[in-house]
Structures are given as structure tokens and as C-alpha cells.
Amino acid sequence: MFLNKYISNYSRTRAVSCAPVLSYKKCSYRNFNGLLQARFQSNNLSWSNRNRVVYKSFQPNPRDKRFQWIFGALIAGGGVYYFTHLEYVPISNRRRFNDVSLDFEKRMAQDAYKEVMSEYGDRMLPSYHPTTLYVSRVLKRIIAVSGMSDLKWELHVIRDPTPNAFVLPGGKVFVFEGILPMCKGEDGLAAVLAHETAHQVARHSAEKIAFTRAVSCIVFLAAASLDLSGQLSHFLLNFGLLLPFSRKMETEADYIGLMLMSQACFDPNAAKTLWERMDAAEGQMGKALAFASTHPSSKKRIRKIEEWLPEAQVKRETSDCYHETWPMLQSFKEVHW
């Protein structure tokens, strides 16, 4: 990364236009830890020798030209690769870059599933437990409208007071008992499950892998060319790119989840009241700097949900929830468990 050598001969020194003199000082440079240091050496040239100096710094360097061709080819190839891996996110219709295959995502999810089971396996409620049946009843309605009923969904309710829930790629759903009191009923639980299901619908896990790989390469090249320290480039990568990207995905999952729960005939207003309770429960713990968080603040989420509520209400009304409840319930049989 650093160039640690002296440029001591005149042919590799940048030429400076000046009036004819019998003696001059030339500069040789050394790049050391990002600082440009110069030392001056006195050299006496006769007037007759002045015209013999060849300013090679003004002559084209074949190596530089070859580097430009290689760099240009990489940029062009990267552009083609980027545009050929663009796709649209379901429901939100956001266009994004994603080069992670379903098989790779599946392998990653299997490893994550093993880790979760090894940590919480002894605290899983049985499938016939009333709490598991309650969560399953709500989740089935969300899955029925998600467009992903063909997955082999698995629900695990964990006996743990932590208010948490998540879905792994492939339909592995984990719900902690601690989230249930905060939901205050099926509509609130639907808001949680729809949000987590939305991450699966949008394939956010795969997109995050693709985004991280791409921006890591860009930051590495920028750090090398600008001579940035490792800590600074790491700071820029995380706080300037990865964390804002994570908050963007969470916001998108809020939107997709709100549409899903509305289409499944749950009350979308429950999503707003859920985050109001979350905001109150966070207290001082929720006062952390926004730029250092992977999730938007509860207040920001509430404001966005308020913007989307009219659309969500229309989605619910067009789903004809009051006349087609039983046909939709019958469709649950088609979901694979």
C-alpha cells in the first residue's frame, strides 16, 4: 500500500519550469506512512549541460497506459455484472442488486439453523402447546398471502422472556415468548410475524451478503488508492454503508409486513400501536445514536407506518376480509408444515 523508495535520479523527478541557472536543487521524494517527505540535494550543472536533461516525467509510461486499460476493463466488466444481476423486490418493487444464489442462501440458513437449535433447542415448546398453536394460527394467515406457501415452513416457540422473533431463509420461524405480552393480541402478533416474514419474501439475507461483498471491494480499492488506514476504512464501511443499508431493509420489511398483515385481514393499526409500546418500553435504552443502530428508531417507524396506513387500509378492504374469511382459512391446508 505504501511506496517506500527514493526517487533519486533526475529522470524520475517531476520537472519544474524555471529560468536558466548554473546550479539548482532537485527533489527526491519518499512516501512514508502517508506523508510526503522531500530532501534536497545540490547538483551543479554547467550551462552547456542544461539542454541535455531529458524530462522523462512528461513522456507517456507504457505501464501506466496498460494499467489504465486493465482498470477500465474491470470497471466495464463490473458494470455489466451489476446490471445483469438487478431484480425487483416483491411488493415494494424496489430494484436491487443480488448475485447470491438460492442454493448458497440455503446452505447459509442451514448453518444458522443448527446454531440456533444448539442454543435454544432445550427450550422449544412442543407443537401441541397452546402457545405454539396460538402463534401458528396467526402465522398461517400471513403465509397464505405471502406467495411463499410452497416452502416447508417450521415454527419454533422458545421459552425465553426476551422480546424477539426472526425468520431464517427457507421458512424457519423462531418466536420468543417474551414478545407475546407486548403484542396484546393476534393483530399485534401479526404485525411482528408479518415483518419477519417480509424479510423472507424480500430475501434480505441474500441481498445483505451481496451488498457487503460489493461495497467491501469498493472500500478496499478506495482505501488502497487514497492510502487510508484500516481502522478508518472499517469505520466508513460500517457506519457509512452497512448500518444505513440495514436500516433501509428494516424499513422495507415494515412496509411489506404492513401490506401482508392487511391482506391477511388483520388490523394494520395494530402495527402502529405495537411500535408505540416498543418505544415506551425502550426508554433510555432506545436513546442510542441512530447512526450506530441496525434498526430505525421506534419513532421513525411509527411515522412511516402512519404514512402507509391509508394504503394498508385499502389493501385490507380489497381483500374482502368480511366475506371471504372462510375460503381463506381453507387455503391454510395448502401450506406445508
From Swiss-Prot:
Activity control: Protease activity is induced in response to various mitochondrial stress.
Disulfide bonds: 265-321
Protein name as catalogued: Mitochondrial metalloendopeptidase OMA1
Keywords, ordered alphabetically: Disulfide bond, Hydrolase, Membrane, Metal-binding, Metalloprotease, Mitochondrion, Mitochondrion inner membrane, Protease, Transmembrane, Transmembrane helix, Zinc
Domain of life assignment: Eukaryota
Species of origin: Schizosaccharomyces pombe (strain 972 / ATCC 24843)
Enzyme class: hydrolase
Known cofactor(s): Zn(2+)
Topological category with respect to the lipid bilayer: Single-pass membrane protein
Sequence ranges on the Mitochondrial intermembrane membrane side: 90-337
Ranges in the topological domain labelled Mitochondrial matrix: 1-68
